[in-house]
Amino acid sequence: METTVLGVQPRIIKKNDAEKIRKSGNVPAVVYHKGEETVAVSVNELELNKLVHTAESHIIDLRFPDGKVKRSFIKAVQFHPVTDRIIHTDFQLFAADEVIEMDVPVSVTGESVGVDKGGKLQILRHNLTLKGKPTDMPDHLVIDITDMEIGSIVHVKDIPAQSYENLEIMIDPETPVVSVVAPKVEVETEEAPEAAAAPEAEA
């Protein structure tokens, strides 16, 4: 899994502080680890967007102003309900040998025979939660859709074990992840005949 560096600025939580941070082009966030005190920080919105809106998961080295670097991953992201901008983020710290739960993006490879026949590919789960050591976490979970016909569904239990070796998928094995559905058939409706002209009133 790729590791990237993200600068953070410690902050003191005050009234209306979060809104001021957002107006300055940054995002309020917290950094936490089990058994440690939670630290309030802010991060650059543009840099954070690059990490959140990506097809791959990342290990993030949070760099503090004093030069300290703490290894983390994004645990939670809150979006504005209207603008869809990131309004808050949680970073979870971890040790190299620590077992964590992390959301990993789902990606597909291959050309589906069902799609070639006019079917539509649907990715039903864009992320799956994996449990294991950080060093074993993949950038994404790859699903080969080559043999998927119209009506085919790939469930969690169908994902090859080598895609997540030494890891556990923390979701019901029967959960559908990818499917190929039949195209919608548009039903042609005949135009209703024009209504007969109303008889003229007698003089």
UniProtKB/Swiss-Prot annotation:
Keywords: Ribonucleoprotein, Ribosomal protein, RNA-binding, rRNA-binding
Top-level taxon of origin: Bacteria
Disulphide bridges, residue numbers: none
Coiled coil: none
Keyword Ribosomal protein included in the entry's annotation: yes
One GO BP: translation
Name of the protein this chain belongs to: Large ribosomal subunit protein bL25
Species for this entry: Chlorobium phaeovibrioides (strain DSM 265 / 1930)
Organism classification: Bacteria, Pseudomonadati, Chlorobiota, Chlorobiia, Chlorobiales
Gene name of this polypeptide: rplY
